[in-house]
């Protein structure tokens, strides 16, 4: 049995991502929302920020109160300069998290965790939209990572 080195696999994909971001005509702005003071969550958020930044994204990690997160997501959805939204879960640890996950507009849902994207995974719908069949649907990151490994 072969031992898989996830860091080696990730390096290949991160390099491709960095090259793609470099070719874009706009600076990609991603906003990450964390509504927790939990040290491991903050550590993960900071590590994620480093990866996004290293890949060439402008990454704005925002610490918000969990009762203000809904309004912040709505503002980020409406902000034409924000291209992607990342939320660090759990926030409430209940169905409210599902609501927040689905509040992110599908065009900014870089985690592909909303029903828009997970439904496409469930139905094997590989197109991002009905309008442009050439744009691939996003796959939530954990299932995608399993497939890639």
Predicted regions and their residues:
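Positively charged, low-complexity intrinsically disordered leader regions
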Residues: 1-26
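Anion-binding alpha/beta catalytic cores of soluble intermediary-metabolism enzymes, centered on
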Residues: 3-4, 11, 84-149
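Generic secondary-structure signature for well-ordered alpha-helical cores
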Residues: 19-26, 53, 57, 78-81, ...
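Short beta-strand segments enriched in small/hydrophobic residues
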Residues: 25-36
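Structural motif
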Residues: 34-37, 64, 88-90
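Glycine- and acidic-residue-enriched helix-capping/strand-helix junction motifs
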Residues: 35-46
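Short beta-strand elements in bilobed, periplasmic/extracellular small-molecule ligand-binding domains
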Residues: 49-64
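Short, well-structured alpha-helical segments in soluble
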Residues: 68-80
């Amino acid at each position: 049995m072969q031992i898989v080195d996830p860091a080696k696999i990730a390096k290949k994909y991160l390099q491709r991502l960095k090259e793609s971001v470099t070719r874009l005509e706009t600076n990609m702005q991603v906003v990450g929302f964390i509504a927790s003071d939990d040290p491991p969550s903050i550590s993960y958020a900071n590590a994620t920020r480093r990866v996004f930044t290293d890949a060439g994204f402008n990454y704005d990690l925002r610490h918000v109160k969990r009762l203000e997160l809904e309004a912040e997501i709505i503002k980020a959805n409406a902000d034409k300069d924000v291209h992607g939204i990342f939320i660090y879960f759990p926030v409430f640890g209940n169905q409210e998290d599902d609501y927040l996950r689905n509040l992110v507009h599908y065009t900014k849902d870089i985690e592909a965790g909303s029903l828009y994207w997970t439904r496409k995974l469930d139905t094997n719908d590989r197109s991002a939209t009905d309008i442009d069949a050439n744009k691939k649907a996003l796959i939530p990151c954990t299932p995608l990572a399993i497939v890639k490994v």
